Regions:
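OB-fold and OB-like single-stranded nucleic-acid-recognition modules
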Residues: 1-114
Length: 114
C-alpha cells in the first residue's frame, strides 16, 4: 500500500500497537498474499512495538535465518529475519528489551513481523 504514484516511494505508517491487538484484527489476503490487517478503522501493514525477546532460534544452516519471539505483556509474536539482515541482528539475546518497527506478514495461518 505504499504510494508510488508520484514517482517517490512513500513508506507506510508504523502504527504503535500492542501484540494482543494484532491478534484481534482481521488479516486481508489476496491470492494468499497478505495485504493488510484491519483493526478498527485502521489498515495496518507496519507496526511499532516495544517488547522483550523471550526466545531466539538461529537456524545455523546454509540458508541462515532467525526466529525471535517478542512479548509485550499483552501477547507474543514471532519476528522472522532472513538473508542479509541476519548478521545485523545476531547480537540480540533472550531477555533484551527491543523496539521493533517492521512489516506484518501472514503465512500458514500465522501473523508475524519481518
Amino acid at each position: 500500500m505504499a504510494d508510488q504514484t508520484s514517482g517517490q516511494f512513500k513508506r507506510n505508517v508504523a502504527f504503535k500497537v500492542r501484540i494482543g491487538e494484532i491478534f484481534l484484527g482481521k488479516p486481508f489476503l489476496e491470492n494468499e498474499k497478505f495485504l493488510f490487517l484491519e483493526l478498527g478503522n485502521r489498515k495496518i501493514i507496519r507496526v511499532n512495538i516495544i517488547g522483550n525477546i523471550v526466545d531466539k532460534y538461529d537456524s545455523q544452516s546454509e540458508k541462515r535465518y532467525f526466529f525471535l519471539t517478542l512479548d509485550d505483556g499483552s501477547g507474543q509474536i514471532k519476528l522472522k529475519i532472513f538473508g542479509d539482515d541476519v548478521e545485523k541482528f545476531s547480537d540480540i539475546r533472550q531477555g533484551q528489551t527491543v523496539a521493533v518497527i517492521g512489516n506484518l506478514r501472514h503465512f500458514n495461518n500465522e501473523i508475524y513481523i519481518s
